[in-house]
């Protein structure tokens, strides 16, 4: 944050009383001519320090110049991304008299005048170009009593609070080492700019300038004593160690059952299992409830298991209900290609456990979308019949609230009304919409 003496001289020249007769556009051109983007943060830190010290920056036009430059350096970025946005929030946020007294003793920003507040609020909104054609001296003399300007900075304050919450606790408890004099000189000797510039140079230049120092809690731990203390804890080292190897008798013992189950499971992902293999696999899963986590089933392999062995997939999903990955398994299941086996798995799961409604709704939407997009008429008719039977089962068993999908399902039935099952589903929807109870087990004709 340190500045070279030449850079500080250029900055103080832009901030001088004489420069306050130049327009804001001219001040901006002079500033960007002297300082590059890499120097903006260091220059901004010096400007904030000057704003905190009324005896170094006493006049309103100079403060207006400082506020304008803090905004101008980061005007192309969002306001919350400006590292000095907290300065704007502090100056625009009104404080009580007691808080103002506390701030003057804590090195915070002193209050600003109404024209300064008006100018700052214009910067935070969409400032008109005519405003930058004025000079700081003209803005400081504006009469704004007839045009009060209030803006909502709650969004900015929230963003600043989130940024501050990420800081270390020690940093949040620190404050600058440069404090304003609470009892300024009352000799009325006037402001001497040369003296103020010398003081500013001593504060911000040099290898370790006071601007970079601050006060914060230091957690200093005492050095442990070199001599033995009374009642000191003694560390005992055995003088005659006796090491005995503790053998794990079960280690390296071949587990034939586990190997066989993994072999069957690997086959289940590729082809249907025989009845004997299914019985053996499900029997071992019943004996050891944790076996399901160690035989190779992952969310990515679930579609292969569903297509080749839907009954095994159902039993394994039921045993994985307490797993932290069950949401991933459900997501893969409802997004896989629609088929008779996937419908069978979803239907059995809905009757066995309470699936999240959003997963069921997503699966129904995917089924309807698949039926609408398929080109083969024979396959389309077959899938539509499957979907209609599946939906009737869900509705009659009261697993879904049909009102949540009424419009989508009704449009599906109308589109495929030529198919008998779709017409039956449509009549069931109308029956429910009229408040009637559908007859259990009634077959649509």
Curated annotation (Swiss-Prot):
<keyword id="KW-0943">RNA-mediated gene silencing</keyword>
<dbReference type="Pfam" id="PF10155">
    <property type="entry name" value="CNOT11"/>
</dbReference>
<dbReference type="InterPro" id="IPR019312">
    <property type="entry name" value="CNOT11"/>
</dbReference>
<comment type="similarity">
    <text>Belongs to the CNOT11 family.</text>
</comment>
<keyword id="KW-0804">Transcription</keyword>
<protein>
    <recommendedName>
        <fullName>CCR4-NOT transcription complex subunit 11</fullName>
    </recommendedName>
</protein>
<keyword id="KW-0805">Transcription regulation</keyword>
<dbReference type="GO" id="GO:0005737">
    <property type="term" value="C:cytoplasm"/>
</dbReference>
<keyword id="KW-0810">Translation regulation</keyword>
<keyword id="KW-0539">Nucleus</keyword>
<keyword id="KW-0963">Cytoplasm</keyword>
<dbReference type="GO" id="GO:0031047">
    <property type="term" value="P:regulatory ncRNA-mediated gene silencing"/>
</dbReference>
<dbReference type="GO" id="GO:0005634">
    <property type="term" value="C:nucleus"/>
</dbReference>
<dbReference type="GO" id="GO:0030014">
    <property type="term" value="C:CCR4-NOT complex"/>
</dbReference>
<comment type="function">
    <text>Component of the CCR4-NOT complex which is one of the major cellular mRNA deadenylases and is linked to various cellular processes including bulk mRNA degradation, miRNA-mediated repression, translational repression during translational initiation and general transcription regulation. Additional complex functions may be a consequence of its influence on mRNA expression. Is required for the association of cnot10 with the CCR4-NOT complex. Seems not to be required for complex deadenylase function.</text>
</comment>
<dbReference type="GO" id="GO:0006417">
    <property type="term" value="P:regulation of translation"/>
</dbReference>
<comment type="subunit">
    <text>Component of the CCR4-NOT complex. cnot10 and cnot11 form a subcomplex docked to the cnot1 scaffold.</text>
</comment>
<feature type="compositionally biased region" description="Low complexity">
    <location>
        <begin position="174"/>
        <end position="193"/>
    </location>
</feature>
<feature type="region of interest" description="Disordered">
    <location>
        <begin position="169"/>
        <end position="193"/>
    </location>
</feature>
């Amino acid at each position: 944050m340190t500045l070279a003496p030449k850079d500080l001289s250029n900055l103080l020249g832009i901030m001088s009383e004489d420069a306050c007769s130049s327009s804001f556009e001219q001040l901006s051109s002079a500033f960007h001519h002297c300082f590059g983007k890499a120097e903006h943060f260091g220059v901004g830190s010096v400007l904030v320090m000057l704003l905190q010290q009324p005896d170094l920056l006493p006049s309103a036009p100079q403060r207006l110049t400082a506020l304008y430059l803090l905004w101008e350096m980061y005007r192309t970025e969002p306001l919350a991304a400006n590292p000095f946005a907290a300065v704007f929030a502090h100056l625009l946020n009104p404080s009580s008299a007691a808080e103002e007294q506390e701030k003057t003793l804590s090195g915070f920003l002193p209050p600003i005048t109404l024209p300064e507040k008006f100018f700052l609020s214009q910067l935070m909104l969409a400032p008109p170009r005519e405003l930058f054609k004025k000079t700081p001296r003209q803005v400081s003399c504006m009469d704004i009593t007839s045009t009060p300007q209030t803006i909502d900075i709650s969004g900015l304050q929230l963003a600043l609070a989130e940024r501050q919450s990420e800081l270390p606790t020690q940093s949040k408890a620190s404050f600058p080492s440069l404090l304003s004099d609470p009892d300024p000189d009352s000799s009325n000797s006037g402001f001497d700019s040369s003296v103020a510039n010398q003081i500013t140079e001593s504060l911000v230049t040099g290898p370790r300038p006071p601007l970079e120092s601050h006060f914060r809690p230091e957690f200093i731990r005492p050095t442990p004593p070199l001599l033995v203390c009374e009642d000191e804890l003694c560390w005992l080292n055995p003088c005659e160690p006796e090491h005995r190897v503790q053998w794990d008798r079960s280690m390296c013992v071949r587990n034939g059952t586990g190997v066989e189950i993994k072999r069957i499971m690997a086959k289940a992902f590729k082809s249907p299992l025989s009845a004997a293999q299914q019985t053996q696999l499900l029997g071992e899963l019943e004996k050891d409830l944790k076996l399901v986590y160690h035989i190779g089933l992952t969310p990515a392999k679930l579609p292969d298991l569903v297509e080749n062995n839907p009954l095994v997939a159902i039993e394994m999903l039921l045993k994985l209900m307490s797993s932290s990955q069950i949401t991933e398994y459900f997501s893969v299941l409802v997004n896989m290609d629609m088929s008779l086996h996937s419908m069978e798995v979803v239907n059995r799961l809905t009757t066995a456990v309470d699936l999240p409604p959003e997963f069921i709704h997503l699966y129904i939407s995917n089924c309807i979308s698949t039926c609408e997009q398929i080109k083969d008429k024979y396959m389309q008719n077959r899938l539509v019949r499957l979907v209609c039977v599946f939906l009737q089962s869900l509705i009659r068993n009261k697993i879904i609230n049909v009102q949540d999908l009424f419009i989508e399902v009704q449009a599906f039935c109308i589109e495929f009304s030529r198919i008998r099952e779709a017409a039956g589903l449509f009549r069931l929807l109308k029956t429910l919409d009229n408040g009637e109870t559908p007859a259990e087990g009634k077959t649509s004709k």
